[in-house]
Amino acid sequence: MELKDKKILVVGLAKTGVAVTRFLAQAGAFVTVTDMREEEALSDVLAELSDLDITYELGRHVPYSFLMADLIVVSPGVPMDIKPLEMARSQKRRVVSEVELASWFIKAPMVAITGTNGKTTTTTLTGEIFKACGFETFVGGNIGNPLIELAESGQEVSRVVVELSSFQLEGVESFRPDVAVLLNITEDHLDRYHSFQEYIDAKLRIFENQTADDFAVLNIDDPLVAACASKLKAQLFPMSRLHELEEGISYRDGFITFSHKGKVLRFGTEGFKLKGVHNLDNIMASLASTLLMRCDGDCAYEAVKNFKGLPHRMELVEEIDGVAYYEDSKGTNVGSVVKSLESFDSGITLIAGGKDKGGSYEPLAPLVESRVSHLVLIGEAKARMNEALGSLTDTHLAETLEEAVEISRRLTKPGGVVLFSPACSSFDMFKNYEERAQRFKAAVRAGKKGEA
């Protein structure tokens, strides 16, 4: 689509909206930006865009602007079912996401990764493998830089790796990755979606425009993921920790085996720095994606062995008086916390809670009952979590994260583990999950210094 002189409306002025606005303005479009927040709340953002000739509609959405736009680009934080967007679609206005817009201007081969959990680790590792194997690589999307920044920069790259949330996938039309990865699906974001099926449908849009020339990497150990295999137009490339595969990538007895069209590569896992059963899925997905896109096996293996993982994902903070403190603030849904709890056999003090996302906490029940010695709950969700899980183990309610850490310190015996894995978002008490993580680390280290 030619952007010059087109009337384009950008909905939402968070990080992605700012990047889209800058790209469109520099492409010669007539850009209007709308956000429900008032000007005072957006002062920093507006300063970033002060050099551009654009129109602002703040504190409200003006229906006329939606109806007159040649194109509407929606930021991922804005629900697609708000009334102005529904009205615009009913009048045949074109409504897309930033990822869709960016894809029109990016020609390099692309790996796109989605799933409820593990996206960021898999995306980062995939990018590291490509770079180690000599490919000029852009890594972005839901992680780090919006994809549109690659289009804006004009940077020549030979590989693109993009992490995609369900929100970003809602607004795709023609977006077509060469390799699309679906890691897992568990309940999440039910505070935004009307049903779990609606969330699943958003995830599956990653495969919508693929053809038989492309690959779909599916974790067939997840029944919801496996169920979509029959609907694919791309070539299925399965991954599994439970089954040996003649075609695909699988794990058995300390080795990952990649099998594709008669080519077989085996990788020992003993030297991997990235620990945890759940990370085997992330590693297999990264290896599958990069090997399918012409990475050398030895080079890819070395990159995996050297990858240490990311902060806020099962990060060991300190070991104090024989107790290990793990920070897993990125564990914002139940499925993620299940994976984290499975990394320990028993003796866990679990700190959980935050802003309730509307899903069921019942999937945690067997692990809480069998492995969690003490449960400490915080935040807006603590009452509902206590109702679902409180009777299964020794349970305590705390008003602050710092109080939760102090309670955990008193309760946990040497040899035990304090795991902060919230199963909730952070927005009831913190700006984001990073701030929540830093507060947990500070509280842990304050105890080490005897300040608590």
Swiss-Prot record:
GO terms for cellular component: cytoplasm. It catalyses: UDP-N-acetyl-alpha-D-muramoyl-L-alanine + D-glutamate + ATP = UDP-N-acetyl-alpha-D-muramoyl-L-alanyl-D-glutamate + ADP + phosphate + H(+). It holds the Pfam family Mur_ligase_C. Its EC number is 6.3.2.9. Its main location: cytoplasm. Gene3D superfamilies: Mur ligase, C-terminal domain, Mur-like, catalytic domain, NAD(P)-binding Rossmann-like Domain. The keyword Mitochondrion does not apply. GO terms for biological process: cell division; cell wall organization; peptidoglycan biosynthetic process; regulation of cell shape. Pathway: Cell wall biogenesis; peptidoglycan biosynthesis. Disulfide bonds: none annotated. ATP binds at residues 115-121. InterPro entries: Mur-like_cat_sf (IPR036565), Mur_ligase_C (IPR004101), Mur_ligase_C_dom_sf (IPR036615), Mur_ligase_cen (IPR013221), MurD (IPR005762). It is found in: Cytoplasm. It is an enzyme of class 6 (ligase). Cell wall formation. Catalyzes the addition of glutamate to the nucleotide precursor UDP-N-acetylmuramoyl-L-alanine (UMA). Belongs to the MurCDEF family. This is UDP-N-acetylmuramoylalanine--D-glutamate ligase.
